[in-house]
């Protein structure tokens, strides 16, 4: 009898473990590294996370000055596990920036590049890729941009009529030199949902990111939210914080 009881305990424990494993497999992440070719012939490495269901909303992740999608860490996977199709995209200047020996040098280097190419070619190609996926609803795509990525995102949001934008550590009066003011871009973006994020002590905009984001919030019409995280940080650092990740996932679910 005692031996029989142990067998039953072992058997049911096995069933529980098997069920948990089966659920993990069912809800697991289908991750694929893809090479996206832009209209001007550049080849961009990206990682695509397919959704578990059809007609899913999509999210494109645009990196910071480093132009490297890998700096998002586990964020793409967490977004995917929450039900989104996710494309994490490298930007064309990744290899150039990788040679910089400091953050200051990286910023100086990126400022000398053709930044509009990041909108006209890189982001456009990412949007086309994600929109073409049969499991993705092309009318429900959001862009999350961190630091430099937020500048690319706000212009792309207007240019390509993106459903929702998450702009992390955006700062300054203009997205790119000699381009439309951010105030005008926000007006052009219209009533569509926009989330502004920054840290309490964000070094963006020479320490004026907090002041700038409060202005953006005032300028924006329609659906908008301003999320100021505790402590210090900038761009991807903010998004990686557990509370920030949860907040963004919830916000996207409510606005896509």
Predicted regions and their residues:
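N-terminal cap/lid segment of alpha/beta-hydrolase-fold proteins
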Residues: 23-53
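Short beta-strand element of the alpha/beta-hydrolase
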Residues: 56-64
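The serine-hydrolase catalytic nucleophile loop
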Residues: 65-77, 91
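Conserved alpha/beta-hydrolase
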Residues: 79-103
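Primarily recognizes the serine-hydrolase "nucleophile elbow" in alpha/beta-hydrolase
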Residues: 125-189
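The feature captures the conserved acid-bearing segment of alpha/beta-hydrolase catalytic domains
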Residues: 164, 171-228
């Amino acid at each position: 009898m005692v031996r029989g009881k142990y067998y039953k305990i072992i058997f049911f424990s096995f069933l529980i473990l098997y069920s948990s494993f089966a659920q993990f497999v069912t809800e697991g992440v289908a991750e694929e590294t893809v090479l996206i070719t832009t209209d001007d012939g550049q080849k961009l490495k990206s990682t695509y996370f397919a959704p578990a269901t059809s007609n899913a909303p999509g999210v494109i992740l645009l990196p910071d000055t480093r132009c490297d999608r890998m700096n998002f860490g586990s964020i793409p996977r967490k977004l995917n596990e929450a039900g989104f199709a996710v494309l994490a995209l490298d930007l064309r200047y990744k290899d150039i920036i990788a040679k910089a020996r400091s953050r200051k040098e990286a910023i100086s280097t990126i400022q000398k590049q053709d930044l509009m190419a990041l909108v006209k070619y890189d982001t456009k190609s990412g949007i086309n890729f994600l929109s073409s996926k049969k499991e993705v609803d092309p009318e429900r795509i959001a862009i999350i941009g961190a630091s430099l990525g937020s500048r690319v995102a706000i212009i792309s949001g207007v240019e390509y009529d993106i459903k929702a934008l998450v702009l992390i550590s955006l700062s300054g009066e203009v997205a790119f030199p000699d381009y439309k003011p951010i105030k005008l871009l926000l007006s052009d973006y219209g009533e569509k949902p926009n989330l502004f994020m920054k840290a309490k002590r964000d070094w963006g905009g020479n320490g004026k990111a907090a002041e700038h984001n409060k202005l953006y919030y005032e300028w924006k019409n329609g659906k908008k939210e301003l999320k100021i995280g505790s402590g210090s940080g900038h761009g991807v650092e903010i998004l990686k914080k557990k509370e920030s990740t949860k907040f963004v996932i919830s916000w996207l679910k409510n606005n896509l």
